[in-house]
Structures are given as structure tokens and as C-alpha cells.
Amino acid sequence: MATINTNNTNNEGMYAKIKTTKGDILIQLEYEKTPLTVANFIGLAEGKIKNNKKAIGEPYYNGLKFHRVIADFMIQGGCPDGNGMGGPGYQFPDEIHPDLKHSGPGILSMANAGPGTNGSQFFITHKETPWLDGKHTVFGSVVEGQDVVNAIAQDDLINEVIIEKNGEKANNFDAAKIFTSELEKLKKEAEIKAENAK
């Protein structure tokens, strides 16, 4: 069972510690480059975003399984139904950032069923997957525990997701508020784009 060296979370930033049946995975979250996606992940992890699967205050990811594991590709989790078909009861737009690519092992990215269908499902890569660039929102990367990612098998559990914030910017990141404001901002941008396309 792998444990996390907490020195890695002493650096400024925002981290998610995913505690699994195989050990811990520590991920640095890209909250400045993908605020909506990170706010969604944190809000669900901490039970602060309204969804149709769990009550407010109840951590969304705790007890869910990695329902899809493909060797030499990725592990996928975050489906409340355990079959890849479930979500939180809402969807939000992609948040593709040019600096964030599926550039190697340990990339945290949103699973989706096409553009604008993000919900709660995410995946972590085993290797570089450039064909996913521009199609899936990258929002973090593993800083410790890639061996755990590689050891995860189908139906292994996410026991708990713990969010750790270091530094003023990270500590001021209010996931529930940011999720709402970023979602509104992206909707307005899409409306303007659609209007200009007429």
C-alpha cells in the first residue's frame, strides 16, 4: 500500500489526494488554467455542489469505483452508477487550455461523451495520449502515486478524495462560487459566439 510523502503538498497550489484500495494518488490541480473543471471536481469531492446523486455535504466520489480500466491507456472513475453511464445530473462545457496536453503518464482529464458533456467522470493516463488533446479537458497531473495508478484494476474503489490547498490563491478558491460564476461566463461566451456566427 503506497502512502503519500506530504512534503509534495507543501508547495503552493491545490492538490487532490485520491485514496484508493491500492494506495494513494496525489494530483496537482490546474485551478488557474481550468477553474470551472477544478471547481466542479473539488465541489463534488467536498460535497459542496448540488447534484442528483448525493446530498449537499456528502462527498460525491467516496465509495465509487474505477469502472473502466484499459491497460497501457488509462483508469476511469467518478460514475455514481458504476457503469460509465452516470453523472451528477448536469453537464458543463469543455475547458481546453493550450498549455495542458495529454503529454504522458499521470494526466488527470475529464471523461465525456462529446463536446460539452462533462459531469463527474474523470480518467488518469498510463501514457501519452495526444489523440485526446482538444477533446478532453486536462485539469491536473499526478505528482506522486503513478505506481498506484498503474496498479489499479477494474472495480477498485475510490475510498476518499481529500483536497489540500497551499498558499493564498489556492485557499481563496471557493469551488461552489467559482463553479457557478465560470459556468455563467462560459454560457455567455457561447451565446455571443453563436450570435456572431449568424
Q: Residue ranges of each PLM-predicted region?
A:
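Cyclophilin-like peptidyl-prolyl cis-trans isomerases
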Residues: 1-198
